[in-house]
Amino acid sequence: MPAENHTTLTPDTPVRYLKGVGPKTAERFEKLGIVTLADLLCHYPRRYIDFTKPYSIAEAPTDVECVVRAEVFAKPGGRILPGGRRMERITAGDDVSSLEITWFNNPYAAQKLQLGQEYYFQGIVTGGMLRRQMVNPQVRTAEQIKASPFEAVYPQTEGLTSNAIAKCVRQLLPHAELLPDPLPPEMLAKYRLLSKADAVRAIHCPATEEQAYAARRRLIYEAVSYTHLRAHETDQYL
């Protein structure tokens, strides 16, 4: 059960009852207009990171977000910098080039990587062809990408990152049926639309680009139908 001390979940259950969401985090969610579980399920991603199309190190664009596939060549370890920050550094590479990867104040990120193992690093590549670098990237294995090839990127706020939002959303996805479906079954069948629950699960965690498209199509259709209904109701009162 994803909620703490709140055995019955409803769309109106406050988001603070989610595991790991304390009062301060709930306040940050509220800055995004997220107060209830329904609000969180309907906080849709603004884009996705596609881990299925990685670059080689040499071909990776610089100064923009991208995914690079590389093998861990060396793990020289970490050190403490002036001011108390801890720096961890590894060298990764492929058949042609090498990539220097650095993490600050995140020793576990480097320590969990295995020498000789291939990983997918998502971040911003800097430097020239002779020395390429990446700082604080996200890391995934091939097995993780097979299970979840697209990573949702959410609108965020200070103190509440997209990753933190994604963790909370994943808690709720098994309970997507909490949201009522405003579209009747005959309409879903006629226009070949996903159910509300399936669309919400797919928009947050699509397995393919086609699945993400189907989810967006359903949710856009719902929004347009709602707008038309409100316009019709307004006309009746004029």
Language model: regions and residue ranges:
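Residue-level detector of conserved catalytic or cofactor/ligand-binding positions
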Residues: 228-238
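Structural detector for short beta-strands of small beta-barrel domains
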Residues: 63-80
